[in-house]
Regions:
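Positively charged n-region of N-terminal signal peptides that target proteins for export
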Residues: 1-4
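Gly/Pro-rich, tryptophan- and cysteine-flecked surface segments typical
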Residues: 18-249
Length: 249
């Protein structure tokens, strides 16, 4: 089940961070192989101006995520590397799909764009042994947050999964607090999060002795992170994504 969580990605909150020349977005979860593919759509909503985007893929352990990605015409854009660079005319949209012909590998993606109007979404697809689609989830790109929360629901056998990416070049101590439906903190812990790395877990792995509940998991660090929650119905398929909430520091 943990491999399923590691295979689906990322945040459901859209925004941008950048200077006058560059805007940076993230997909905090990317899955390639083992019955999974990731598709990234990019569009230039700028009126009358060319948009550019560079997508850098990083593995969960912080090393370059080298894989093959095909465009909508079947051209291999990465050729075993870990970057896609694209120019888009005004109104143009592109599609990039990972080639899932190896064992499962996961990580996250960083998108550098020349405009806040160059926007993107990701779609994560799971296949059975015969190549049939059995589940999909789509999420938009996101910016990191210093303090955030994810809704939790573990009633009726449902499992809540969490995936977090640390896009910073420094290791972070992350403080987790689990709040019940009345807002009371019922469990807490601190986890060290490596630089440029990613972690994924089910709530019952982080807090194994907590009974079935509805509430929220909130967490914070000294540098911002990106996250997504995944709600898995028994026996783990189908699933859906849950958006993070930005909290006041």
């Amino acid at each position: 089940m943990r491999r399923v969580l590691l295979s689906v990605a990322s945040i459901v909150f859209v925004s941008a961070v950048g200077s006058a020349q560059q805007f940076t977005y993230y997909f905090p979860q990317i899955a390639v192989g083992g019955g999974w593919t990731t598709t990234i759509f990019v569009s230039n909503a700028t009126a009358g101006a060319t948009g550019t985007a560079t997508i850098i893929f990083t593995k969960s352990d912080g090393t370059p995520f080298k894989s093959n990605w095909l465009d909508e015409k079947g051209n291999d854009l990465t050729k075993g590397g870990n970057a896609i660079a694209v120019q888009l005319a005004s109104g143009e949209s592109r599609k990039f799909t990972s080639v899932g012909d190896a064992s499962l590998t996961t990580g996250f993606a960083t998108v550098f764009a020349n405009s806040s109007a160059v926007l993107s979404n990701a779609m994560f697809t799971q296949f059975d042994g015969n190549g049939n689609v059995i589940a999909e989830a789509g999420v938009p790109m996101a910016i990191p947050l210093l303090k955030q929360a994810l809704f939790v629901d573990t009633t009726n056998g449902i499992r809540t999964g969490v995936a977090i990416a640390n896009p910073n070049v420094v290791s972070l101590p992350v403080q987790f607090q689990l709040l019940n439906d009345t807002g009371q903190v019922i469990a807490s812990t601190t986890v060290q999060f490596g630089a440029s790395q990613q972690m994924a877990f089910f709530l019952d792995q982080l807090f194994p002795n907590v009974p079935a509940m509805v509430g929220r998991l909130q967490f914070s660090a000294t540098n911002p992170m990106t996250s997504v929650a995944l709600r898995f119905n028994p026996p783990g398929i189908p699933f859906t994504t849950l958006s993070p909430l930005a909290l006041a520091n």
